């Protein structure tokens, strides 16, 4: 369609009309006109409203595509007349039709919306001054000028303050003032919509500009630092690039969508904080105090002398190598004091400058938030358990489960939904633009043809069209009727780059091509690449000269091979075709850099070319399908990834400048407050340090930096660091996961390509043929012919199915399967006849074993035996030798279990046969365990103890019954299905990390050594400059435990960096490093931070997030499979199927009958009254608030006031309990919340009467406080008014069971590792994170430690202890001493495997579960029905069916449908709607509730534009005994119609007669 067509002109005139003075008064007259249509279009507006411009309840809202600051949609932008750009227009958003607004659209299509009211009470939209201001404001050059000014200002903010910067500040202030004046004149100040101060961005601009003028007269001190917040305006630069805009729109939408979740999170933190306050108030001040001397050195014992003695810190216990005083406790399992000391509370401050405590509500809230974010939480965890006892792990489990695993993953779900929405919107916009371009091209061709210019359009590369005159086209067709003649450039390119000059040369090309393009040559190059990678990985510190020469020679050889390969391929293919392959281009670049490295090898300062050797590693992707797939997908999504990285680093830049301006001077002015009086490495004194401290907070470590900031500053550090963590870690990094989910689905779930496998098979075939020429006796070797792809697929599926088949699948039949495979029967055809006695006996034995194996009681007995033997393993701790009875029990149980599991294996072998037994993973596990048992038994009889740990393998059998637990199938199947994909990601991650490991060896090998004194204090470089000086002065030249001396250590160091545990020391050593054998200097090599930043971005943020992607996708598939949903079902079918399932599972509830007795009736009315519930809610809030103001060290008067208030609340809650019990009677106890209330009241009253007795013998007041805090959970019922909170709580409620299943799986894994941890590490020496409380000596202590390690917290300290092989004592078998040495190899295998299984797999399953359920709930709320809709239906149904008979009368149906609320409501008159629903009618004219609900569900889907066909989804059958439909509403209408016809005919007949 042409641009000047009548249709376009009409649409232009309708949409884009210049704003006139007449329109200023027009909107006031329009409401009356519109109101006249309200009743007329009521039903249409409800059912057929403007989709995106209507809320779920039908209320209108502005069109998001036309909102202020947006860009015109593609179709509107295509028809927008250029002459109306920057001109006031009538508002084209229907929402603003009745409001005094107008819009201005720029040439680029940006929308600016203004109020039609007078600006500053005197400037209407047509005043020349305001029109000039509007025209200036909407000009892109004005925005670009302001943005450039802000960016330049940001650069000057980085610089130190000088006279020049002061003058520039005045210049910037003048520019900002002009901007404010222009915008205020154009928009107005504040009174009208879209005024200047109605935009939150302008609040900051105005405040900072105002402060700038005030500071010219008055010194505002630190308040002047608020000017730093102007840097937030640089955020608007993202609108320049469309890709950046998509990311920022997703970020903004995520933050705005998180408001409901933030309120829920704050409520949860509030509850946990009050609970922590009541439990741990003052606990973290407990210290070991020396006994009062009895020798009279302090005089006689008096209270004053006791206080002075215990207040003296010299009398507090502190080990020699400790910095802070250790905490202690008086409960079992807590930290014990040494002899001569007593654990007392209230001495000294709290840990970490006093900022870690539960003494007041504020500090408790901060501590709980720290627990939820898992930042250095292991320190608080260890402090609390050391001082309160090991059973307090339950508090931390609850906080971490609900806070971290649940609510923080809700943030991921919201961010993923926001990103998906914005990407979908951007894709739709791009698709619309592409469609418009096609229409425009077609219209242009049609227009030219109509004007008599006969032309032909030829599409080139699918993107652009070239219009060629018919005469030229005919001339070209004479030479080549199909292709156009090549241009001069093409002919010159062919002459120079296509080498086909003569026949001998072409033969030479063919011969070389046959070699270099053969599969054998490809395999040879792959082997060379692997060898080259191996040689690069062998580089290490302190290599001898001979080894270094070998590596150098190897590099020369590999470089020569690559050069020869490139030259041969260029000769064989010619340059034109060689460089068309991207892999060839990559290979050629590597060759160029290799030649440059060889040529500049001896030049000082150009060793940087050595780093380009690492590019050779990526050549392996050409021969590794998994890596190739990963890199290809990574390349495709490169743009989106770069956009996310840009937004992330822009945020870091903004926060870094803000932090530097706000807190920078505090570190300089108050440096003496730090313990050593030295400036900490992480500070805000300059931009680089500010950037790194903000980057550290983005990585999840913010609490320690915040403590330092608060030590030299004030509480304002808290909101800054919380904001950085929230936006950076919880939103930006989750955006990266959303990007992976959106772009990496093929890598996460699709199988890898087998093209390279076929090449490898061809190469191996060639090798066999070559050997055949030399060895004729190899003729017997035959290669099987290639199977068709379909056969391969079928075979692989069969094998995979056999591997994944569970025991229940094998035992599902009625008869035992074949015992052996088909090949066995072919090899031994002579078997006993089927009717022989031997065969019958064999069959009977197998039949009996088969029936026994199928018996559920036998299976339960085996499971019970497994649990018992696992419990016995848990009892084998370090104290077992001190319990001889238990030793004998475990010994005899081992014998019995060995016999039992052997018998069970024989029974299962007879039952399922060898074929099925050895093709099932679970039976293979049983077989390995039994073999380990037998081997262990033999070794015990032989007196060999080295391999007796093989019996621990039986603990792995716990996973088999785990898969049979109800509800665990989805979790275990997700874990099993994810294993191959996880293994692929691990391999890709190891390969990807290899690049950084080799680079780290090249950069830091041998440079982490340092000179230390006898106290392990690093000496200054001014004392010892190098290794020789250190040894000459009799100091110690030692290496850091984590270093880059070789690739193995480099991998371990990178793992600590990727998990952000122990990474600070590694980075400190790196930036302090100089040359080999040189003493480090603080931050002399500070730009080495870049190496770690790049690794964290690509190696941690990118690679490790792939695990989340895999688990989310596979869990979704397994859950659909478990629910019987097909992967081919449409989205509407899935939503409707879920709605049908809810319909069939819900039932009406009987209403509580009202008592007939008048006093009880009054109590009933009060109990069910909503105002009474609101009153009690307010009282609960006040009760919790009183609990929150409780604090440690409060005065006696304050405590008495709290006691009186507590008594008042107990009386009030007692009265409430009496009222409800009297009114509701026994129905009161059917509500779990009422049971909690009743239990609290009973225990509270008992506590008042028998406080001393209860505290000493029955229950402590602390537990009463815990029960009291549970009442706060009742507040969750009052979140029903907030739809967003209801959806989140609904998703949590639905996911809770699956989340518990994941937690149970995590516990089983912890159980297994606790057993192995006790076996391997119970005797290790206390070091690092291992001490008298946290160790592997007992099962309980192992679980406590493994729970901490499940979040990767403190694993670096644990590794240091269990890998200690030097500073320890070797075992002495003669003395029976087991030794306290660790094992480096065993420690690495134990910890790395545990971290991968828990942190990267199981913990990420929480995210998968939460995301899946949140998406389901939001899909249902948008296109389906929520649980609130079902609850509403049953509440209304209860009014018509108070006895819960599940039936109502047919004549009540119309009233029922009218009484419902949207979206289920069907307003009167609804007679014909009822007929169209065709609801079944049962006997006695009753309607069944499921029929009504199912009909309403179908009606809702139909009205929302997603009708479900009759055959799409079959609803489950109703198996009610009394359900007997006899008719339907439609059939009843037909019957009534027929009756009326008969009656009318009869009347006519009677009248005629």
From Swiss-Prot:
Q: How is its activity regulated?
A: Inhibited by the pore blockers saxitoxin and tetrodotoxin.
Keyword line: Cell membrane, Disulfide bond, Glycoprotein, Ion channel, Ion transport, Membrane, Repeat, Sodium, Sodium channel, Sodium transport, Transmembrane, Transmembrane helix, Transport, Voltage-gated channel
Q: Name one GO molecular function term.
A: voltage-gated monoatomic cation channel activity
Q: In which tissues is it expressed?
A: Detected in adult nerve cord, muscle, gut and mushroom-shaped accessory glands.
Those parts of the protein on the Extracellular side are 160-165, 219-224, 281-360, 386-392, 539-549, 604-605, 659-686, 708-719, 876-888, 941-945, 1002-1047, 1070-1086, 1190-1200, 1250-1262, 1317-1338, 1362-1387
| Sugar attachment sites | 300, 308, 312, 330, 683, 1015, 1028, 1034
Cite the residue spans of the region called Disordered: 1-68
List the InterPro entries hit by this protein, alphabetically.
GPHH_dom, Ion_trans_dom, Na_channel_asu, VGCC_Ca_Na, Volt_channel_dom_sf
Q: Where is this site: Interacts with the spider Mu-diguetoxin-Dc1a?
A: 539, 542-543, 549, 613, 1002, 1027, 1032
Which residues bind tetrodotoxin per the record?
701, 704, 1062, 1354, 1356
- Write down the intramembrane regions as start-end ranges: 361-385, 687-707, 1048-1069, 1339-1361
UniProt family annotation: Belongs to the sodium channel (TC 1.A.1.10) family.
Q: What protein name is recorded for this chain?
A: Sodium channel protein PaFPC1
Origin species: Periplaneta americana
